[in-house]
């Protein structure tokens, strides 16, 4: 992996981690276009750049996270289902990883996004929840439970949680914001658990630490931009463009990678 490869992959991770388009699918597609094989080194690199993206959420919402205890309770409630299922089914989840599965999930969840938005337009929700304060513990649990679907590669963690938020009565911007915040405990836990389970592989790749840190820093900067732009976008528009994009990128995946 070259410096240019590290920068490109960091940009892709930062742009796609919090958009409902599957960062995993985009990283696989990009790696294929760069002629990078799915090696242990690349897997370690992806863990590090994911950490960079998580830190961007912490930075963006730092003041809210620092002072809002109720929000933390909701995030913990949302995190628990994923933590339990992820711990129990870790090996099985990892065995699901395949490029074909990624393509199927890109298409399936793309269609789901389109259908959910069309149904919302036909039957607008009453008493939409407009703020994070309005989210109940029950809704937080339901949204957190939806993260379990995202364990299947190509689903998109943000995609699953945003759809669950919309179905729970949250408006688009609040659904996105809670999805981003829920990533903090979820992705920190996943990152550290992955690092622990693969500690020998990480130790063997310490020669690449500078590339890893470069990619993580790039992902952090790009994710800062992506989070702010995405929240502005969904305050004005719906999620149908993302559903269409997922389907298009699935076909690109089939053409360039499979």
Swiss-Prot record:
One of its GO terms (molecular function) is undecaprenyl-diphosphatase activity. The chain crosses the membrane at residues 1-21, 42-62, 71-91, 96-116, 134-154, 173-193, 211-231, 237-257. The gene is uppP. Keywords: Antibiotic resistance, Cell inner membrane, Cell membrane, Cell shape, Cell wall biogenesis/degradation, Hydrolase, Membrane, Peptidoglycan synthesis, Transmembrane, Transmembrane helix. Pfam families: BacA (PF02673). Bacitracin is thought to be involved in the inhibition of peptidoglycan synthesis by sequestering undecaprenyl diphosphate, thereby reducing the pool of lipid carrier available. Its main location: membrane. Belongs to the UppP family. Catalyzes the dephosphorylation of undecaprenyl diphosphate (UPP). Confers resistance to bacitracin. It comes from the Bacteria. It comes from Campylobacter hominis (strain ATCC BAA-381 / DSM 21671 / CCUG 45161 / LMG 19568 / NCTC 13146 / CH001A). This is Undecaprenyl-diphosphatase. HAMAP family: Undec_diphosphatase. It is found in: Cell inner membrane. It catalyses: di-trans,octa-cis-undecaprenyl diphosphate + H2O = di-trans,octa-cis-undecaprenyl phosphate + phosphate + H(+). Its EC number is 3.6.1.27. One of its GO terms (biological process) is response to antibiotic. One of its GO terms (cellular component) is plasma membrane. It is a multi-pass membrane protein.
């Amino acid at each position: 992996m070259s410096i240019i490869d590290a920068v490109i992959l960091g940009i892709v991770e930062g742009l796609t981690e919090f958009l409902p388009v599957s960062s995993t699918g985009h990283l696989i597609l990009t790696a294929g276009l760069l002629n990078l094989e799915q090696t242990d080194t690349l897997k370690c690199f992806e863990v590090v750049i994911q950490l960079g993206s998580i830190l961007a959420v912490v930075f963006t919402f730092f003041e809210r996270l620092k002072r809002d205890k109720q929000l933390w309770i909701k995030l913990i409630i949302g995190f628990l289902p994923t933590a339990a299922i992820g711990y129990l089914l870790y090996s099985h989840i990892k065995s699901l990883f395949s490029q074909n599965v990624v393509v199927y999930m890109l298409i399936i969840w793309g269609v789901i996004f389109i259908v959910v938005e069309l149904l919302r337009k036909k039957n607008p929700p009453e008493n939409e929840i407009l703020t994070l304060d309005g989210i109940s513990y029950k809704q937080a649990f339901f949204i957190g439970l939806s993260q379990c679907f995202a364990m299947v590669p190509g689903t998109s963690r943000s995609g699953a949680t945003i759809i669950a938020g919309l179905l729970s009565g949250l408006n688009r911007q609040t659904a996105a914001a809670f999805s981003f915040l829920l990533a903090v405990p979820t992705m920190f836990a996943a990152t550290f658990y992955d690092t622990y389970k693969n500690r020998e592989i990480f130790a063997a790749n310490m020669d690449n630490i500078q590339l890893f840190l470069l990619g993580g820093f790039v992902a952090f900067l790009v994710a800062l931009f992506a989070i702010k732009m995405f929240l502005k976008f969904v305050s004005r528009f719906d999620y149908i463009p993302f559903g269409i994009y997922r389907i298009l990128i699935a076909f690109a995946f089939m053409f360039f990678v499979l």
